[in-house]
Amino acid sequence: MPLSRLIIQQFRNIKACDIDLSAGFNFLIGPNGSGKTSVLEAIYLLGHGRSFKSSLTGRVIQNECDELFVHGRFLNSDQFELPIGINKQRDGSTEVKIGGQSGQKLAQLAQVLPLQLIHPEGFDLLTDGPKHRRAFIDWGVFHTEPAFYDAWGRFKRLNKQRNALLKTARSYRELSYWDQEMAHLAENISQWRALYIEQMKTVAETICQTFLPEFEIQLKYYRGWDKDTPYHEILEKNFERDQSLGYTFSGPNKADLRIKVNGTPVEDVLSRGQLKLMVCALRVAQGQHLTEMTGKQCIYLIDDFASELDSQRRKRLADCLKETGAQVFVSSITESQIADMLDDTGKLFHVEHGRIE
């Protein structure tokens, strides 16, 4: 479901732009600081309700302006254009419109506009803490299991309440009622995540093998507590330890995706270029799996395409993205860096000082 039109107003150094887009590849060419990454950032904000570069709304609103606006039109499965838009005020308030209807939720934006981001800081998926890999898993579960979003939100609220109760509870009995619901939610969340990884794993390992044929890739899901023990037993058994820590030590909030090559953690084996290629492979695999499961196409946002990738690796990624048939946005400093992707169906935009032509 590609974007056919994009309007950006008062976003970073982009005062106003209105561009028609290709359903295939869209290239943003310009020097550093020109605004090409800001276009990707605006699309990401349209699909996620937040920037991927800053958590502070005020930093992405243009100086001396009180608000920003990003509007898009995309073709739905019936080939009708559906308008979507997001308005953010400097005070942090947000308005979302879908199909002309105000008061929509950010989660609904994410549902209608699934996005995959590949950017220079994307190594954290493989090299940093489990929270990045949980987010990777949960992107997929969110798009394939309708009950997940509410269940995960409910679990996080209950976990926060439990952590507060741990500070005052005199016995486990004071927590047992809340723990019953927490345990039920945790088991469901874990089952959905495990099923997602099991279904997506074959696609991911195949694409990783294509990108990095010299390595054998293994993905393994860890649910956040002992696999042979029900979660309600873990909560009761670890009550005193949780009390001493001041928080619930085990649970789906500690889940992880363990990724190895030839039996060794990826961060101990792969170079930076190989790590980036694996991140690309995993993101493309998620998009392909989404299409297989739901019929939806996700949109790929690739910032600084040439970073860490030699010409051979760039060609591998370009060929794989073309095979998906998805819409792709690519930023690059020069046209020569994206030569492997250029064809008659794509669109080339030159970006300079926030102007897009």
UniProtKB/Swiss-Prot annotation:
PROSITE patterns: RECF_1, RECF_2. InterPro entries: DNA-binding_RecF, DNA-binding_RecF_CS, P-loop_NTPase, RecF/RecN/SMC_N, RecF_2. The keyword ATP-binding applies. ATP binds at residues 30-37. One of its GO terms (cellular component) is cytoplasm. Its main location: cytoplasm. It is found in: Cytoplasm. Keywords: ATP-binding, Cytoplasm, DNA damage, DNA repair, DNA replication, DNA-binding, Nucleotide-binding, SOS response. One of its GO terms (molecular function) is single-stranded DNA binding. GO terms for biological process: DNA replication; DNA synthesis involved in DNA repair; double-strand break repair; SOS response. Belongs to the RecF family. The RecF protein is involved in DNA metabolism; it is required for DNA replication and normal SOS inducibility. RecF binds preferentially to single-stranded, linear DNA. It also seems to bind ATP. This is DNA replication and repair protein RecF. The gene is recF.
